[in-house]
Every structure is written in structure tokens, then in C-alpha cells.
Design a protein with these regions (language model features):
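Alpha-helical transmembrane bundles and membrane-interface segments of multipass inner-membrane proteins
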Residues: 1-197
Length: 197
């Protein structure tokens, strides 16, 4: 197995660890900081394995499957967990990801996963090449997760600015998510049409 694929597999295996840390975040800030650190590390690894694969010519079919799977596993897990009220801090029970954000992003990610599977079954084509908007949406989602994990501390120091910042990044996440969703829908339709469906 190539090093990029090993990094991707490690990212996937660390998702349950991230889940456990977030579930314990309200008990101790240490767990929340650990979850934040792990989220940042996974984001860096996500960029690193792609760059490494391209520079070393180690782009493989299994890697093209595992990479988006690792992304979606982390994103969906994080967004579902962060939608729970009081998940991050007992001092801020109302702090959670709004449902209009979580429903939009989780629906988009599930649509991409299911759509990719359907296209593969119908036309035997597996295409996991994210668009520029799709990549931007993923980056903003990582930033949103990090901001949410850091927000209990930020709310103590800059309450108004933190709430404005959170709503801004929530709006940007949804906007990019919807735009990329439409882009993937268009790409999927073209692939099905080319395959005679």
C-alpha cells in the first residue's frame, strides 16, 4: 500500500476517536481541545495525502475511493454531533450547529456518496474528482468544525464577534454546499447521459 493510501486509511480509522472526543467535550475542555487538534491534523493530512499522491504518481483507484470516504465519514460524524445542544460545553447549552446547516450539508454528502454508487452501478464509471467549489466547500467545512470546537472559549472573550463569525461561516458553508451540490448533480447527469441512461 502506498504512503498516501496509508495516510488516508489512518484518517478513516481516527474518525471513531474524534467521535469519542467530541462526545466527551462537555465533561472537560481537554477533550474538546483534543478533538480540535485531531480535526486540524486530519484536515492537514487530507491535503497532504492528495499532494503526495500526485507528486509521487501514486494516484490509485482505491485511494480515489478511500479519500472521499474518509472526508465524508469525518464531516457527517462531526456535523451530526455538533448539532446536539450542549455537546461542547455545559456553560453554553444553546451552542450547537443549526439544523438548517446540518441538514443541508449531511444531505449533500449523502447525495454525493449514494449518487457516486448509483453511477458506478449503472455505467461502471467511478469519478471522484471534486470541483473547485467542492474543494472550497470541504475547506470551509473543516474551518467551521474547528470554529465550533473553539467557540466555547471564544464566546467568553468575544461573545458578539463569535456569534457573528459563526453565523457568517454557517452561511458560507451552506452556500458553497448548495452550489457544489448542483455542480455534482450536473456532472452526474452528464455521466448517466453518456452511458445511455
Amino acid at each position: 500500500m502506498s504512503w498516501p493510501n496509508r495516510i488516508t486509511l489512518l484518517r478513516l480509522l481516527l474518525v471513531p476517536v474524534f467521535i469519542l472526543l467530541v462526545l466527551s467535550a462537555a465533561e472537560s475542555a481537554a477533550y474538546r481541545y483534543a478533538a480540535l487538534g485531531l480535526a486540524v491534523a486530519l484536515g492537514v493530512c487530507d491535503a497532504a495525502d492528495g499532494i503526495l499522491a500526485r507528486r509521487t504518481g501514486a494516484v490509485t483507484r482505491i485511494g480515489s475511493i478511500l479519500d472521499p470516504l474518509a472526508d465524508k465519514a469525518l464531516m457527517i460524524s462531526a456535523i451530526v454531533l455538533l448539532s446536539r445542544k450542549g455537546i461542547l460545553s455545559a456553560d453554553h447549552p444553546a451552542l450547537h450547529l443549526p439544523y438548517w446547516v446540518s441538514v443541508t450539508i449531511v444531505s449533500r454528502d449523502l447525495f454525493i456518496l449514494v449518487g457516486t454508487g448509483i453511477i458506478f452501478l449503472l455505467v461502471s464509471v467511478f469519478q471522484a474528482l471534486p470541483s473547485a467549489v467542492g474543494k472550497a466547500a470541504t475547506v470551509v467545512q473543516f474551518i467551521m468544525i474547528a470554529a465550533m470546537l473553539a467557540s466555547p472559549d471564544l464566546l467568553r472573550w468575544f461573545p458578539s464577534a463569535t456569534w457573528y463569525g459563526l453565523y457568517g461561516i454557517w452561511g458560507m458553508t451552506v452556500l458553497l454546499g448548495v452550489i457544489s451540490w448542483l455542480g455534482y448533480l450536473r456532472t452526474g447527469s452528464k455521466l448517466l447521459s453518456a452511458g445511455g441512461h
